[in-house]
Amino acid sequence: MYAIVRSGGRQHKVAVGDIVEVDKISTAKVGDTVELSTLLVVDGDAVTSDPWVLDGIKVTAEIVDHHKGAKIDILRYKNKTGYRRRQGHRQQYTAIKVTGIPAAAK
């Protein structure tokens, strides 16, 4: 059984026990439980994508860690003028462990 969930404007395919890296959830601390909105549930041959059915289904997950991703270098360069700008960015992520995917009602 797996589900497609939405977190931080992105979609992730998750199953029970998976550890997934999502954009930082700033309101939660390590060890807290969060609920993620479900877009699709696949249970064997049964596929549930009806928004009316999935409205009540929330995937539960536990916060494992808050960390930063790899450094990304942003370089701007204009030819023949000597204009150069360098900037770096490290995205903040939250690692979550999926603890439960409720079965969709038929």
UniProtKB/Swiss-Prot annotation:
Query: InterPro entries, from UniProt?
Result: bL21-like (IPR028909), bL21-like_sf (IPR036164), Ribosomal_bL21 (IPR001787), Ribosomal_bL21_CS (IPR018258)
Q: Name one GO cellular component term.
A: ribonucleoprotein complex
Query: Any one Gene Ontology biological process term?
Result: translation
Molecular function per GO: rRNA binding; structural constituent of ribosome
Looking at the keywords, is RNA-binding present? yes
Please name the PROSITE patterns in this protein's record. RIBOSOMAL_L21
Q: Name one Pfam family in it.
A: Ribosomal_L21p
Q: Which UniProt keywords apply?
A: Ribonucleoprotein, Ribosomal protein, RNA-binding, rRNA-binding
Record note on quaternary structure: Part of the 50S ribosomal subunit. Contacts protein L20.
Q: Belongs to which family?
A: Belongs to the bacterial ribosomal protein bL21 family.
Q: Which PANTHER family match?
A: 50S RIBOSOMAL PROTEIN L21 (PTHR21349), LARGE RIBOSOMAL SUBUNIT PROTEIN BL21M (PTHR21349:SF0)
| Protein function | This protein binds to 23S rRNA in the presence of protein L20.
- Protein name per Swiss-Prot or TrEMBL: Large ribosomal subunit protein bL21
